[in-house]
C-alpha cells in the first residue's frame, strides 16, 4: 500500500501565502480543512507552511508526506443523518521546524505573497517568557518568535504598509488576538526595536480575536487498518473530527472578501465583537454538558451519546437549554435556537464516545462559570429559580459522594473541594449535619462562588429538597418531574 506523497498522488499545489504555528490535529482538521475547501471552490489560491513551534521530533514532520493528509469528518448532518466524509487535504505545502531550520523560518518573512498567520500553540502558548532575546535562534515563547518574524518582514520590505499580516490565533483564551498583540508589543519595546516598527505593527497588521468550535478526535488509532483499506493508501496523519464547526473572527469586514467567504460560504462569521458568541457557546454548549453530566452519570449512563438517546435525560437537557438558558441570553432567539439545535445534534454524534466522567473534571468551577450566571439571571428576570439548573446543582453536590450503585468512581477537582466534600458527606452519613446544612455550607463558599449564594432567596431550600429526593429515590425518580 502506497504512503501519501505528491509524486504518487499528484494534484493542485498552491503558492505559499499562509504561515501556521502549530502542526497538531486541531488546526489540520479546522483551519487547513477550511483553506482546502476555499482553494477548491474559489480563487483563494493559498498554500500553508506549517511551523512546528516547539522542539520535538514527535509526531514526525508532515513533510514526510509532502504536506498531504486525509481528514475524516463524521457525525450527524443538519438533517440528523449519520455522515462520514473523507477528504485529501492539499492546502499544506510543507512543515518546518523553527529549532532546526531557523534561517528557513526567517525567510518566510521575505515572501511578498505571505498574508495570513494562524496559530494554535495551546492555551499556555500565548504567554510571556522572561529572558526571551531578539538574538535567540529561536526565542522560547510563541509571541517572541512572532515578534522576531514580524521584524524580519518589516526590515526586508522597509516598513511597506501593504506587507503587513492578518494574524488569526486559535488558542482557547479570551480575546486571544488582543492578548497576542499586547505580548508582541511588549517584546518589541523590551528589545528596544525602532519606533517605526511599533507604528508599522499597529498600522499595517491586524490581530484578530477568535472563537473556534469543533471537536477534533484526531488520529483514529483503533480504526486505522479499516480506514486505510477503504482509502487505498497509508496515511500516518489521518485526522478525524465532528461534522459541526464554527469559526468566529473579530476583524475587519474586508476579511470576508480576502478569505473569499463571499464566493464560498463556510460557517465563518466576521464580527465586531466575539463576546456574545463566546457567551452563547459557554452557556449553551458547555452549560448543557455541565448540567447533563452529574444527572446522566448518576442515572446509570456513561457517555454523552447514551444520555442523548435516553428519552428522559434528553428531555431534561433540552428543556434546560430552551426554557432556562436561552431566554436569558443576549442574542436573537432564532440564532440561539439554531445553535442549540446544532449542539444537541453534536451530543448525539454516534462517532464520538464522550465519557461523562472525563467531562466531569473540575465540575465546581464549570458550574460557576457556565451555569450559575443563567441560574441567577433567570431568578432575577422571573422571580423564581430555574428548576432544572437548580436541580443540576443538587445533582453536582450528590456526584461528589463518589459512589454509584455501591461502586466508587474517581472524582477529579481541586484538592480543596475533594477534601471538603469528603468531610461533608462523611458528616452527613454520620448524622452530624442534615442535607440543608450541607447545602448551605457549600453555597456559602464565597471564595469559590465569588458571592454568598445562601443569600439568593430560596436557593438553599430548593437545592436541599432536590438533593434529598436524589438521595431517597435515586436520580431517575428524582429527575423525572423535570423531564
Swiss-Prot record:
Protein name: Altronate oxidoreductase
Pfam families the UniProt entry points to: Mannitol_dh, Mannitol_dh_C
Family statement: Belongs to the mannitol dehydrogenase family. UxaB subfamily.
Organism: Escherichia fergusonii (strain ATCC 35469 / DSM 13698 / CCUG 18766 / IAM 14443 / JCM 21226 / LMG 7866 / NBRC 102419 / NCTC 12128 / CDC 0568-73)
Pathway linked to the protein: Carbohydrate metabolism; pentose and glucuronate interconversion
Family matches, as InterPro entries: 6-PGluconate_DH-like_C_sf (IPR008927), 6PGD_dom2 (IPR013328), Altronate_OxRdtase (IPR023668), Mannitol_DH_C (IPR013118), Mannitol_DH_N (IPR013131), NAD(P)-bd_dom_sf (IPR036291)
Keywords tagged on the record: NAD, Oxidoreductase
GO biological process terms, semicolon-separated: D-galacturonate catabolic process; mannitol catabolic process
A GO cellular component annotation in the UniProt record: cytosol
Recorded superkingdom: Bacteria
Gene responsible for this protein: uxaB
EC number of the protein: 1.1.1.58
Catalytic activity: D-altronate + NAD(+) = keto-D-tagaturonate + NADH + H(+)
GO MF entries: mannitol-1-phosphate 5-dehydrogenase activity; tagaturonate reductase activity
Positions with a binding annotation for NAD(+): 18-29
Amino acid at each position: 500500500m502506497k504512503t501519501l506523497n505528491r509524486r504518487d498522488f499528484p494534484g493542485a499545489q498552491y503558492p505559499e501565502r499562509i504561515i501556521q504555528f502549530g502542526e497538531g490535529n486541531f488546526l489540520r482538521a479546522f483551519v487547513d480543512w477550511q483553506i482546502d475547501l476555499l482553494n477548491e471552490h474559489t480563487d483563494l489560491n493559498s498554500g500553508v507552511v506549517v511551523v512546528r513551534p516547539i522542539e520535538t521530533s514527535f509526531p514526525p514532520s508532515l513533510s514526510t508526506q509532502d504536506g498531504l493528509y486525509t481528514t475524516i469528518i463524521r457525525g450527524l448532518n443538519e438533517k440528523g443523518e449519520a455522515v462520514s466524509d473523507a477528504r485529501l487535504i492539499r492546502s499544506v505545502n510543507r512543515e518546518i521546524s523553527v529549532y532546526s531550520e531557523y534561517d528557513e523560518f526567517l525567510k518566510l518573512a521575505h515572501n511578498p505573497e505571505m498574508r495570513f498567520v494562524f496559530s494554535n500553540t495551546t492555551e499556555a502558548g500565548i504567554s510571556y517568557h522572561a529572558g526571551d532575546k531578539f538574538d535567540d535562534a529561536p526565542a522560547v515563547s510563541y509571541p517572541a518568535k512572532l515578534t522576531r518574524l514580524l521584524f524580519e518582514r518589516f526590515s526586508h520590505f522597509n516598513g511597506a504598509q501593504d506587507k503587513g499580516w492578518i494574524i488569526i490565533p486559535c488558542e482557547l483564551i479570551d480575546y486571544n488576538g488582543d492578548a497576542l498583540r499586547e505580548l508582541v508589543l511588549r517584546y518589541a519595546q523590551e528589545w528596544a526595536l525602532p519606533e517605526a516598527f511599533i507604528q508599522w505593527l499597529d498600522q499595517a497588521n491586524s490581530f484578530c480575536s477568535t472563537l473556534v468550535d469543533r471537536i477534533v478526535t484526531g488520529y483514529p488509532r483503533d480504526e486505522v487498518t479499516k480506514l486505510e483499506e477503504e482509502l487505498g493508501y497509508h496515511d500516518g496523519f489521518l485526522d478525524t473530527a465532528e461534522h459541526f464547526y464554527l469559526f468566529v473572527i473579530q476583524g475587519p469586514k474586508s476579511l470576508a472578501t480576502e478569505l473569499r467567504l463571499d464566493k464560498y460560504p463556510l460557517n465563518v462569521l466576521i464580527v465586531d465583537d466575539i463576546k456574545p458568541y463566546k457567551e452563547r457557546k459557554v452557556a449553551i454548549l458547555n452549560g448543557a454538558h455541565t448540567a447533563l453530566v452529574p444527572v446522566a452519570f448518576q442515572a446509570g449512563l456513561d457517555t454523552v451519546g447514551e444520555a442523548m438517546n435516553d428519552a428522559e435525560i434528553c428531555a431534561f437537557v433540552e428543556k434546560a437549554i430552551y426554557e432556562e438558558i436561552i431566554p436569558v441570553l443576549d442574542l436573537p432567539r432564532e440564532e440561539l435556537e439554531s445553535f442549540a439545535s446544532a449542539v444537541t445534534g453534536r451530543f448525539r454524534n454516534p462517532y464520538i464516545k464522550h465519557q461523562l466522567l472525563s467531562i466531569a473534571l473540575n465540575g465546581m468551577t464549570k458550574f460557576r462559570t457556565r451555569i450559575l450566571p443563567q441560574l441567577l439571571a433567570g431568578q432575577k428576570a422571573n422571580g423564581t429559580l430555574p428548576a432544572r439548573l437548580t436541580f443540576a446543582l443538587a445533582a453536582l453536590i450528590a456526584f461528589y459522594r463518589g459512589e454509584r450503585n455501591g461502586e466508587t468512581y474517581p472524582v477529579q477537582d481541586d484538592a480543596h473541594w475533594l477534601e471538603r466534600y469528603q468531610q461533608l458527606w462523611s458528616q452527613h452519613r454520620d448524622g452530624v449535619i442534615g442535607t440543608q446544612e450541607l447545602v448551605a455550607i457549600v453555597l456559602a463558599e464565597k471564595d469559590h462562588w465569588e458571592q454568598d449564594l445562601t443569600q439568593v432567596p430560596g436557593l438553599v431550600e430548593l437545592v436541599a429538597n432536590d438533593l434529598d429526593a436524589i438521595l431517597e429515590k435515586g436520580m431517575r425518580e428524582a429527575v423525572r418531574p423535570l423531564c
